[in-house]
Amino acid sequence: MHLLQCLLSTISLASTVTAFVPYSFNLEVSTEGPPSNDVARRFVPWKLLLDDSYNNHGSSSNGVSLTLDLKKFPVRRDNKYKVVLADEPTTPNTAALNQEGLDYSYFATVRVGSQGQQMWLVLDTGGPNTWVFGSDCTTVACQRHETFGEAASKSLKLLPLNWAVGYGTGLVSGVLGTDSLSLAGLDVNMTFGLAKNASTDFESYPVDGILGLGRSANSNFNTPSFMETVATQRLLKSNIIGFSFSRNSDGARDGAANFGDLDTTRFTGDIVYTNTTGDSNNWRIPLDDASVNGTPCRFVNKTAVIDTGTSYAMLPPKDATVLHNLIPGAVTTSHGQNFTLPCNSTAVVQVSFSGLSYNISPKDYVGPAYGSACLSTIVGQALYGDDVWLLGDVFLKNVYSVFDYDNHRIGFANRSVPIASPTTTVAAAANPSATDGAGSTLTGSMAVHTGSASIVSRFVHWPFIFALLCMVLV
């Protein structure tokens, strides 16, 4: 975004594609659009298009609702969310990566402001911008989350600038402010957004905001990003982040993000790096190829955006079709947009970078049951054009990934085999103390995040797909 636009009354939060929405909507999304360098961050939820029998009103010709009952999860009751808390790490500068129990989203506890208010933020390499729900927000989505404002921090300085982020059915918008953020032993003073309005997209989702860890040094506020501030203050010996994502079915609560150094206990073999390519907005690297059961797909001139804020893998429809054609029993629906496959698939799916291949486990690419088959979590969506993939947590759960800000590269190694942790159901106290960490007060695998409002319990349909970005800059 140009400097002049940053001085306008509304600032768009992000400029890279990412995916992150708890609901699915009946939206028309183009899968064949050309790539654009001038897009603002937008989370666009969409519905699965299973076959041509579905009409534009969200139902089939037989009157069956398009909304898929993939899995019902009681995410909120009396302003509480059930989540799986990761074990508190013992290594320095490391944050526990919690999740909601479906491998759908991962988030860390960040302390905000002079009183160190605990908030759950997605650590998102898809963009450099950071925002939290503000205390001035009165929408239901905000009331169901922890909020932050002047009453919670004597050091908060509000700025006369606004921002807005577009969603499929609404907006999240607010003001900018400057205050301290503390994560993994790193204390950073920076500018971030405080949401004053939020659409229904976040009503049933656990997170209180997003911490942008994109490759760009500056956010779209034209202010330094979190990692740029860390680098300027020389808080780490190396400006790198290593991610290890938990898989809930493994029974281990070992998700973590470590800053400044490699955690050699979390991977086997060597880290092999690939230099980034393209503009500085994305963590994008050249993709060698993909294969199924050893048969190469023979993709050429492809690149992949590696995004911790995206749940699934999104490939251009033609590429997704080629890959699924090699999986025994896979069936293409929706013109290469969505796929079904055998629920007991054992096909070995691999992607290759810098001459090495990495598995995507059937535990990750086989999604929820649909009829006699299961849905594939590898989706046909051309978010950046016909030659760019978006690889999210479906892939990242299989590797230890390193984002190297100093040398502009991404490294992978195979994850260590996780060891299952004992599980205990516990509840978090309302308004958790600023002096008690999540690991010290919430020691079990199931915990409850508590806010200030009382909301009636309800079940929600969790979506099958994370979402995308498409709002064009004015």
Curated annotation (Swiss-Prot):
Coiled coil: none annotated. GO terms for biological process: proteolysis. It is a lipid-anchor; GPI-anchor. One of its GO terms (molecular function) is aspartic-type endopeptidase activity. Residues 106-413 form the Peptidase A1 domain. Optimum pH is 5.0. The active site is at 124, 307. This is Aspartic-type endopeptidase ctsD. The lineage of its organism: Eukaryota, Fungi, Dikarya, Ascomycota, Pezizomycotina.
